[in-house]
From Swiss-Prot:
Expressed by the venom gland. The lineage of its organism: Eukaryota, Metazoa, Chordata, Craniata, Vertebrata. GO terms for biological process: arachidonate secretion; lipid catabolic process; phospholipid metabolic process. GO terms for molecular function: metal ion binding; phospholipase A2 activity; toxin activity. PLA2 catalyzes the calcium-dependent hydrolysis of the 2-acyl groups in 3-sn-phosphoglycerides. Belongs to the phospholipase A2 family. Group II subfamily. D49 sub-subfamily. Its cofactor is Ca(2+). This is Phospholipase A2 3. The keyword Nucleotidyltransferase does not apply. It comes from Bothrops diporus. InterPro entries: PLipase_A2_dom_sf, PLipase_A2_His_AS. It is found in: Secreted.
């Protein structure tokens, strides 16, 4: 929902390289494939 989406901008630690990360915002092997699933940058677009 919009409240949860807004939290992305409230807590910058959930951003990785300017993209939304759905799982804690950490850039590690476990979360990398799920990082930025809201944005096309995850898929090289």
């Amino acid at each position: 929902n919009l409240w949860q989406f807004g939290r992305v901008f409230v807590y910058p630690d959930v951003l990785c390289k300017g993209c939304y990360c759905g799982w804690g915002g950490r850039m590690d092997i476990y979360t990398y494939s799920r990082c930025c699933f809201v944005h096309d940058c995850c898929y090289g677009k």
